[in-house]
Design a protein with these regions (language model features):
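Active-site-proximal cap/loop segments of hydrolase catalytic domains
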Residues: 1-170
Length: 170
């Protein structure tokens, strides 16, 4: 997983960059769960195309995810070592540039927080800048009332990085 998704998104970004109204220094992507995985891969494997990402409760290594789901698409790890390696954001972390904000609930029982911890460990070992927001006692997604904070910070991220403005929270 990861190869064709990033190929498709990168081709779309190449096309967008041909448009005069596109600022190629501000190409963002966001998603949660599998979308968070794609976001992490876009800022690593696709780092030449994407400048900003907001990844929520993301799979970063398919070896850490539910084997019933993963093996349906990737076969057994022993039968597809290269696929599992290529599909891990950790494999491409060396190519990371831009700005990635990672969010995760500490009680996520779907995509375990170990995914986030391994990626940020890799980034910090390489002295890469990123942003991290953890939500204590939240699961796979942030529920109310913390959802209000999560959404406010989500909007603040885009205001600051794409509009160069502070988001006024009233």
């Amino acid at each position: 997983m990861g190869k064709w998704e990033i190929n498709d998104y990168s081709e779309a970004v190449k096309w967008l960059k041909t448009k005069s109204f596109i600022d190629s220094t501000k190409i963002g992507i966001t998603g949660g769960s599998y979308g968070g995985y794609v976001t992490c891969m876009a800022l690593t494997l696709g780092a030449d195309y994407f400048t900003h990402g907001l990844a929520e409760y993301s799979v970063t290594d398919w070896g850490l995810y539910d084997n019933v789901y993963t093996e349906r698409y990737m076969d057994l790890p022993a039968e597809n070592k290269e696929g599992y390696k290529f599909g891990s954001a950790m494999t491409h972390a060396k190519d990371y540039k831009g700005l990635l904000r990672i969010t995760h609930g500490t009680l996520d029982d779907n995509v375990h927080m170990q995914n986030t911890l391994q990626l940020i460990d890799k980034f910090t070992s390489m002295n890469k800048h990123f942003e991290l927001m953890l939500y204590p006692n939240e699961r796979h997604g942030v529920g109310f009332p913390k959802w209000v904070h999560a959404q406010t910070e989500y909007v603040r991220f885009w205001y600051k990085n794409f509009l160069g403005k502070d988001f006024v929270n009233e």
